[in-house]
Design a protein with these regions (language model features):
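Hydrophobic, Leu/Ile/Phe/Ala-enriched alpha-helical segments that form helix-helix packing faces
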Residues: 1, 205-207
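Charged, low-complexity, helix-prone segments enriched in Lys/Glu/Asp/Gln
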Residues: 9-11, 194-197
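N-terminal Sec-pathway targeting helices
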Residues: 2-23
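Non-catalytic macromolecular-recognition regions in eukaryotic signaling proteins
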Residues: 31-195, 210-247
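Short, structured surface segments that line ligand/substrate-binding pockets
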Residues: 199-205
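Hydrophobic alpha-helical membrane-insertion segments, chiefly the h-region
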Residues: 22-33
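Compositionally biased, low-structure terminal segments
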Residues: 8, 18-19, 45, 202, ...
Length: 247
């Protein structure tokens, strides 16, 4: 009898141990799944990333006897579309969306990377200090989007900013017209390999309810060979590699 009691006790202990290990393993799998896949049913989703690459010449004040004396900038306009999730049952409102932790993971061979927000509603960019993005930028939720005043509709909208490479190159010419696109880089003997770069940043969606979701975005610029194609673009709608997690 005593041997049976001890045997049953050992079995019971082993079963409890097995259940404990199983529960821990299950919790571990859930945590791993969340780490890999992130939030699966957010109130608002990042639905699209559009990047438009080209180049422009900024006319210098002193041109001498020449028609053109321009500093050449390689530009990459970034559009992040935030869309309301129709499958989310509860009502939520966007408080703000922040771009932060901006890093240049791979620097270009020539030039200096800087980020700017538009100076007006027509997405015109003035490269002045007050439009420059330094460590972060916050777009406040409002009734409707207002690019100039850094506002986004609290039910979803589009965030716009520019990644610019101030190449340090110039082009001087007496041509009557100057084509402002990526082919301008060739005139300054700049090739696509010279200006390749990789930028990453976090996008944080904060709701009025106090919940925040953060995801990391990585962008390679310019898109394709802008020096020969003039204007190139990337329209990304598959967001599997952008994992959002609650903060």
């Amino acid at each position: 009898m005593e041997e049976n009691y001890i045997f049953k006790k050992i079995i019971k202990r082993n079963v409890l141990f097995f259940i404990l290990v199983l529960v821990i393993a299950l919790i571990g799998l859930i945590i791993l799944k969340y780490h890999v896949e992130g939030e699966q049913n957010m109130p608002f989703d990042l639905s699209e990333i559009l990047v438009v690459s080209t180049a422009e010449g900024n006319q210098k004040e002193e041109t001498g006897d020449n028609n053109w004396n321009v500093d050449i900038y390689q530009t990459n306009d970034v559009y992040l579309n935030i869309k309301k999730n129709k499958n989310y049952k509860d009502t939520e409102i966007i408080k703000n969306i922040e771009i932060k932790n901006i890093n240049i993971d791979e620097k270009p061979s020539i030039g200096k990377i800087e980020l700017y927000v538009p100076s007006n509603e027509n997405e015109i960019y003035n490269y002045e200090e007050n439009y420059k993005i330094n460590s972060n930028i916050v777009f406040e939720g409002d009734k409707k989007s207002d690019i100039k005043n850094l506002k986004i509709s609290n039910q979803g909208g589009t965030i716009v900013f520019r990644i610019v490479n101030k190449t340090g190159k110039e082009y001087i010419s007496n041509d009557e017209e100057l084509k402002h696109d990526g082919t301008l880089l060739q005139k300054a003997e700049v090739n696509n390999e010279d200006i390749k770069a990789k930028i990453s940043f976090d996008i944080v969606i904060t709701l009025e309810s106090g919940v925040s979701f953060s995801g990391k975005i990585t962008i390679e610029i310019p898109v394709d060979d802008v020096t020969t194609q003039g204007v190139t673009n990337l329209d990304k709608k598959d967001m599997k590699d952008v994992v959002f997690k609650r903060q």
